[in-house]
């Protein structure tokens, strides 16, 4: 029911994008539209245009946000909160970095080239946060995933999570109870 426009298209006029997405909603193929990977000014401009032309507006924003990646706090989150746009961030566990005890290497941490691209450059700076999450998890006898997701759930509508094991789903559910 929510169609998420994945990434801002710099080669297509914004008016054409909004017209096309509005047609998707009016045709009943989706109830709502959301967007991912854009700047706050782009979201504001698109929704202003949609409002002025009686079109569907973006009702959710899927940005890169977690305890390590917090750039969204600068402009996007305040904007979305002021406009009542749902926040549905991706990579809530930083590609597994906020889920694994420091020093433990998993297959995903070794092989996920996209996450390496996002996090390897700042690994030394991020380690302090990862260590703090580990200490809090140990202190409260919960998993690092639970601590990381519990923090995020105080900030956003619904994080987009991915799992490879059944027990990871349990940790995600338990995070709602912290």
Regions found by a protein language model. Give the residues of each.
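Short, hinge-like loop/turn segments at secondary-structure boundaries
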Residues: 50-54, 77-79, 104-108, 176-178
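Phosphate- and divalent-cation-binding pockets in alpha/beta enzyme and binding domains
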Residues: 41-45, 97, 168-171
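Conserved, mostly hydrophobic/aromatic
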Residues: 13, 33, 61, 80, ...
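Glycine/proline-rich, positively charged
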Residues: 1-71, 75
């Amino acid at each position: 029911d929510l169609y998420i426009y994945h990434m801002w298209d710099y080669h297509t006029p914004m008016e054409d994008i909004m017209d096309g997405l509005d047609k998707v909603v009016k045709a009943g193929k989706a109830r709502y539209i959301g967007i991912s990977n854009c700047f706050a000014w782009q979201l504001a401009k698109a929704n202003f245009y949609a409002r002025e032309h009686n079109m569907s507006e973006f009702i959710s924003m899927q940005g890169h946000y977690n305890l390590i990646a917090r750039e969204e706090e600068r402009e996007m989150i305040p904007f979305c909160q002021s406009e009542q746009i749902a926040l549905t961030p991706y990579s809530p566990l930083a590609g597994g970095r906020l889920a694994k005890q420091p020093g433990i290497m998993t297959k995903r941490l070794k092989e996920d080239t996209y996450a390496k691209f996002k996090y390897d450059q700042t690994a030394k700076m991020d380690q302090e946060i990862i260590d703090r999450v580990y200490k809090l998890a140990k202190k409260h006898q919960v998993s690092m995933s639970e601590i990381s997701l519990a923090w995020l759930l105080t900030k956003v509508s619904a994080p987009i999570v991915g799992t490879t094991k059944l027990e990871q789903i349990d940790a995600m559910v338990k995070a709602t109870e912290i």
